[in-house]
Amino acid sequence: MAIEVKNLEQLKSMRKAGLVVADTLELLKRTAQIGMTTLELDEIAATNLVKHGATSSFLGYHGFPAVICASVNEEVVHGIPNKRKLVSGDLLSIDFGAIIEGWHGDAAISFGLGEIDPADQKLMDVCEESMWRGIAAGKKGAKLTDISAAIEGYINSQGKYGILREYGGHGIGSAMHQEPHILNFGPAGNGPEL
C-alpha cells in the first residue's frame, strides 16, 4: 500500500479545496427545500465552484454527469441528481468534491427535510457518531484498522444497524481516491501505523 505523504504546502492547497467543499455543503444544506430537485442543488454547487475558482472532482469522473452525488432515502451512495422533487421526510445525502491547485477535497453530508421519522433521525445520528469515533481513533501511532474497529464497534453497540461492506473511506490528495482504503468494519491493530 503506497500512501502519498503530503508536505506542508500541499496540505495548504488541500485545505483550500476542503474549505470550498465545506462551504458548498453548508450552502446546499441551507438551500435545500421541500419541492426542490437534486438537479437544482447540483446547479447551485456548480455555481459555488466557479465562485471559488475551483473545479469539480466528480464531473466526468468515470463518466459521472454531475458535480454532486445526491442520494435520497434508500439510495445508498453516488446518486445522480435528477428532477424528482424532494418531499417532507426525505433523507438526503450529498457527496461533493472540489479541486484547487491540483489538490482534492471531498466530503459528504446527510440531513432530513421537513418532518423526519425519529427512527430515520436515529440512523443518521448513529452514522455521524460512528464517523467521529473513527476520526478520534485515527491518532498518531494508531494502526489503520483501529479506525475501522472504532466505527464498527460503535455501530454494533447501537443495536439493529448494519454496515455496507462495499463502501468505506479513502485517502485523498492529488487524486480523489487514494490509498489507504479504510473499511468501516474489522479488527483493530492492523495496517500501517498512522
Task: State where each predicted segment sits.
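Active-site neighborhoods and metal-handling regions in enzymes and metal-associated proteins
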Residues: 1-194
